[in-house]
Amino acid sequence: MFDIGVNLTSVQFAKDYHQVVNRAKEAGVLGILITGTDADESLAAQTLAAEYPGYCWSTTGVHPHHASSWQDSVEQKIRTLAATASVVAIGECGLDFNRNFSTPAQQEVAFTAQLALAAELSLPVFLHCRDAHERFIDLLVPWLDKIPAAVVHCFTGNSDELDACLALGLSIGITGWVCDERRGLDLRALLPRIPVQQLLLETDAPYLLPRDLNPKPASRRNEPCFLPHIVQQVAAWRQEDPNWLGQKTDENARRVFRLV
C-alpha cells in the first residue's frame, strides 16, 4: 500500500517525523508522497523526501489557500524543486472557494500557471478542489492532453462530480473521510463506482484521523501508519480483498507518479 498524501512538514510532526516514517514502514506502508503547499513547504517536503530515497517522494506547488503568494519568484522556486529527483508532481494546486483565503481570481491564476508548468515539465498534477467543481474542470480540461496524469487529492465530491472526474480519466484520492459516519457516508456509498485502476488511498496526515479507528492515538494525530485501516475499510465497502486492494492501489500510485 502507498500513502499518496502526507503533510509530513506539519509542525505536528516536527519532533518525531523519523519515528512517523518508521511506524509507517512497520505497518506495511510501502511508500509515502509528502505534500508541498507553498514554496517554503515544498522545499521542506523535498528535503524530507530526500532523507528517505526510494520510500518518500514529494510534490511541489502552491495550494489555493496560498495562491495570493504566486509570482515569478515563486514559480522559479517551484520549477527548481521540480527538477530534483524526489519531486514527482506539481501541486498541491487547484481551487478552493469554500473559505477563499486567496481570491478566486488569484486562485485561477496560480492554478493555470501550475498546470502550464506541469505540461512544460511533463509532470503529473496533484489537485485540490473544494466547492469549485465546475470552474476547476473548466480550467483543467484544456491541459489534460498535455499532462501525464492528474490526481484529485482527498476527493469529497458528490456523485455527479465523481462521474465527471472519472470520465476525464482522473485518479481519485480517498482518505479516512469515508470513515466518518457524520459526513462521509455519501462518499462511502460511491466507492464501488470508482474503477480500481483510478483509485488511490491516502491519510492526509496529520489531519482526518479515521473516526472509526480503535483504539485512537492519545494525540488524536493521524499518521501514515493508519493507512492499513483505511485500506481495510475501503476494501470492505467495495467488497474486495484488502491485501489485493492495497497492492493494486500501490501499483496505481507508482504508475501515476512514474516510480516504476
UniProtKB/Swiss-Prot annotation:
Coiled coil: none
Cofactor(s), by name: Mg(2+)
GO cellular component, one term: cytoplasm
Binding site for a divalent metal cation: E92, H128, H153
Gene3D superfamilies: Metal-dependent hydrolases
EC nos: 3.1.11.-, 3.1.13.-
Listed SUPFAM superfamilies: Metallo-dependent hydrolases
Record-linked InterPro entries: DNase_TatD-rel_CS (IPR018228), Exonuc_TatD (IPR024918), Metal_Hydrolase (IPR032466), TatD-like (IPR001130), TatD-type_Hydrolase (IPR050891)
Pfam families given in the database record: TatD_DNase
UniProt subcellular location: Cytoplasm
MF-aspect GO terms: 3'-5'-RNA exonuclease activity; magnesium ion binding; single-stranded DNA 3'-5' DNA exonuclease activity
Keyword terms, alphabetized: Cytoplasm, Exonuclease, Hydrolase, Magnesium, Metal-binding, Nuclease
Highest taxon of source: Bacteria
Subunit structure comment from the entry: Monomer.
HAMAP family tied to this protein: TatD_exonuclease (MF_00901)
PANTHER family recorded: DEOXYRIBONUCLEASE TATDN1, TATD FAMILY DEOXYRIBONUCLEASE
Function, as annotated: 3'-5' exonuclease that prefers single-stranded DNA and RNA. May play a role in the H(2)O(2)-induced DNA damage repair.
NCBIfam families, per the entry: PRK10425.1
Protein family membership: Belongs to the metallo-dependent hydrolases superfamily. TatD-type hydrolase family. TatD subfamily.
UniProt protein name: 3'-5' ssDNA/RNA exonuclease TatD
